[in-house]
Amino acid sequence: MNIKVISYFAIITFSFVLFFLIQGYGSLKKFSFQDDYSAFLASDKPHDLQIDFKYLNASELMLSGKRFFYDEKFKLAIKSFNFLIDKHPDLIDSSVHSFLAESYYELQGKFSSDVTNHIEKALYLNPSDTRALSLQGLNYFQQNNFEEALKSWSIALENSTNNKEKESLIIAMNLALKKLKN
């Protein structure tokens, strides 16, 4: 063999070993997870909850739940968040429950017991969770309880850091005020 070929092979091998020492196997798993998720979304097969979440760690479960949520695949988001709650109960924060509540609401189109239970759990863990407060306000608004809706939305507005969310809350609050005056 040529000395150049041997040196190229040694450089590539050394780079590969160095990558594993610095980045570890976990980074390859992340790439694999992202590739699998992209392939899953691109496939023509119906997404009938045949994903196996047991090989994902807590952060990957949270990421997959959020990605499914934002891709409007609410059944998969619900499955992902529920699996996260079952397997990692000590790592659950209010955002998991508020995403679950909104996923159930989007899927069912109403404030079922699933939605209200997860809103309550989210607000128990974090009384200023803006997603949960926004949903709670919407629930009160649909029940024509405009004063309570305004209370929930005003707390959400105080705690929100997202300008689009603030604009939506202000619009909702103005509508509730108009309904309250009538």
Spans of features found by a protein language model:
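Alpha-helical adaptor scaffolds
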Residues: 67-70, 82-125, 131
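TPR/TPR-like (Sel1-like) alpha-helical repeat modules
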Residues: 141, 146-164, 171-174
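Alpha-helical segment of the N-proximal tetratricopeptide repeat
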Residues: 35-87
